[in-house]
Amino acid sequence: MTHRFSRWPLVRRALSLAAASVALAACSDSTTEPPPPPQTSEITVDASAAPAYVKLGDPASTVTVTNPSTSAEWDLSFFATSVSVNGGAAGPGGVTAYCLCANANATVSELQAMTPANQLAAFDAVTSGSVPAASSFIADALNPAIHGWVTGTGSSAAAVPTKSWIVRRSAGSVILGKFRVTAVSGATATSAGNVTVEYSIQPSSGAAFGAVQTRTLNVAAGPVYLDLAAGPVSATSAWDLQLSGYDIKVNGGVSGTGGVSALLDDSTPFASITAAYASTAPSVAYRSDSFGGVFATSPWYRYNITGTDNQIWPNFNVYLVRRGDTVFKVQITGYYNTAGVPRQITIRSSRVS
């Protein structure tokens, strides 16, 4: 008897093995490489004449911003020693921050010994495990130069007429004025209602104050702009103070470009504040509006630590900056460039998660 064996099972097996080999090769070829680890960026920005804006990333970069209050293209802004995040009152970016603050209590000798090189290890040690819950991060809020002029809200709101402010215009010739709030009425949870103010201003630089003016301004319907020489004006005119809700803003700093600043005087009666008296206050004592957040409550530097150096000393604290689900770590490592020029801020940053 002759036996015949079919060759097809053998052929099918060979084809199956070949197909498996091709599939394995294809899988090997399509394997993706793991993403590169986050890189540490280091940039220096000129924060001397105007705010400098930084977009964090791999790497971080400086960006040009025309209107920071409407732009989401920046994460951090730097001006002199101030740092703002693009969130809350400062901008629409939803950026928040948190300070790890390991060096908050550093001694003078410890600060003097700190350098960008020897503080790199502390920066590198911050990982995703260092990141707290998102609720621990905070956005920026307005930090007005004129605050504390009212206590309470709604029916309990009351003016604080013992607090006066010397107001300084520095655009062009320096012009001084004085201002206080004497009464509020019709206040709600969100607005001081009718605000009665007293103020006076020099008609020209070096002159005595003019007559004291008294006005009651209704801020319930929206912002009221006040020129201390001309009275209430439109938003597009030159103005010194803006009253809105429970805020009084000066036309300077983050609130305007008018070069207006203010200095609290709660120890001198309003009637005793003359132009001659006001002129004795040094210009560095005045404040413009700023944004206050983590970088304000937990500063990145100490000043004049020896009592005679008059220098800015970075404390090399590491800050966490959150944009959506992405968190970056930031360390400010310098205020001066190699030539000793101030307001040249050096920032070290890297993505954490």
Model-predicted regions and their roles:
Residues 2-16:
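Bacterial N-terminal signal peptides that target proteins for export
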Residues 23-26:
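C-terminal motif of bacterial Sec signal peptides marking the signal peptidase cleavage site
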Residues 17-21:
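Sec-dependent N-terminal signal peptides
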Residues 31-353:
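Surface-exposed, beta-sheet-biased, low-hydrophobicity segments with strongly acidic/polar composition
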